[in-house]
Amino acid sequence: MSATTLLSYEGSITFDKIEQILTLFSQRMPETNCPVCKIRMFSIMVECLENAYRHNYNTPEQNPQISLELTSDENHYKLTIGNRASNIDIEKLTSSIDKFNKLSLSDIKALYNETIHAGHITEKGGAGLGLLKIMRCSREPIIYTTTATDQNSSFVNLSISITDPDKQ
């Protein structure tokens, strides 16, 4: 069975646009298919949109840009989101993803709790919980690709999937 596109967006990202995207998600995500999937995917979308906004590589005269697509098939929901980021940020991101993808769900939960209790806030205002929260909700590895845009930045795409627990 081929995937159905539930939501697609490409353009600038602001807090107002994040709110609009999340509202559209709530309207388009089927209520009856998998309520647990809807809750998990909503949490994943919030984290991904905030991260794409916060870690976007742009000049002061540019608005941050993203691409986003949410699809579903019989058993899965898949969010693909991309944005331009500094190569330094992407190196940290992909290193963390590679590390976290090797962990079990219980290890991810434990690391999440340790990170909360450590209380360290980064210079960008985060605590490093976003990826862990995404992985806790997804329960599947994050797939990523990067494409260089110039010497200092690249476009990074993340693909996050959720499998309907009733259809596993």
Where are these regions (language model features)?
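Conserved beta-strand-loop-beta-strand hairpin that lines the nucleotide-binding pocket
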Residues: M1-L6, K17, R54-Q168
